[in-house]
Structures are given as structure tokens and as C-alpha cells.
Amino acid sequence: MITKVDRNAVRKKRHARVRKKIFGTAERPRLNVFRSNKHIYAQIIDDMKAVTIVSASTLDKEFDLESTGNIEAAKKVGELVAKRALEKGIKKVVFDRGGYLYHGRVKALADAAREAGLEF
């Protein structure tokens, strides 16, 4: 049986492999997702300048749901990050799932961001 520590180490190795290929530019920054057991975080990053342009998480003051570690919370974070990105003039991004499977909360966040107007 794989332990939680081993699973996270495998995820980090997978993310490092993927990060060699995915690179965010000023025209098309990277939408990065990080997931913990209780919260989910999304950042839009310009890798050319190494700057976070927009971020959203379940810890934000605008976040109004009580439960923070479920699919509904991920959808809300996806909408928030897309809304903030569109306010800054960002329409196209590169999706970086952070080494996680494209399923569940990660997929819900991505779908909500797409529906709110981001293209990837």
C-alpha cells in the first residue's frame, strides 16, 4: 500500500516532469492548481517574469462557502480566478494541474474557469 508521504513524493516528481514542458508567458500565463485536504488554491503565473498575476483560494475573503475541501468549493475558486484574470485582461492560459489527476476537484476548478471565460 502506498503511504501518503510516498503519494506526495510521486506527485512532486510528476509535477517536476510536467513543468519542464509547461511554461507560462505574458501572452499565455500558466494556471497552477494546488490542492490540500482542506483547501484548494489557484494561481495565474507569468514564468518569464516569475510573477504571480492573479490568485484565488478557499481562504479568500470573497469565498463564502462553509466547506472548503469539496468540488463545490473548487468550482467557486475556478470562477473567482477566472473573474480576476479577465479583469486583468488575461483570456488565454496554459493549465498546470500540479501533478494531480485531472479528476474531481482539479477538473471542477478547470471546468468552472472555462465556463467563466478563460480559454485553455
UniProtKB/Swiss-Prot annotation:
<protein>
    <recommendedName>
        <fullName>Large ribosomal subunit protein uL18</fullName>
    </recommendedName>
</protein>
<dbReference type="GO" id="GO:0008097">
    <property type="term" value="F:5S rRNA binding"/>
</dbReference>
<dbReference type="Pfam" id="PF00861">
    <property type="entry name" value="Ribosomal_L18p"/>
</dbReference>
<keyword id="KW-0699">rRNA-binding</keyword>
<comment type="similarity">
    <text>Belongs to the universal ribosomal protein uL18 family.</text>
</comment>
<comment type="function">
    <text>This is one of the proteins that bind and probably mediate the attachment of the 5S RNA into the large ribosomal subunit, where it forms part of the central protuberance.</text>
</comment>
<dbReference type="GO" id="GO:0022625">
    <property type="term" value="C:cytosolic large ribosomal subunit"/>
</dbReference>
<dbReference type="GO" id="GO:0006412">
    <property type="term" value="P:translation"/>
</dbReference>
<keyword id="KW-0687">Ribonucleoprotein</keyword>
<dbReference type="InterPro" id="IPR004389">
    <property type="entry name" value="Ribosomal_uL18_bac-type"/>
</dbReference>
<dbReference type="GO" id="GO:0003735">
    <property type="term" value="F:structural constituent of ribosome"/>
</dbReference>
<dbReference type="InterPro" id="IPR005484">
    <property type="entry name" value="Ribosomal_uL18_bac/euk"/>
</dbReference>
<comment type="subunit">
    <text>Part of the 50S ribosomal subunit; part of the 5S rRNA/L5/L18/L25 subcomplex. Contacts the 5S and 23S rRNAs.</text>
</comment>
<keyword id="KW-0694">RNA-binding</keyword>
<keyword id="KW-0689">Ribosomal protein</keyword>
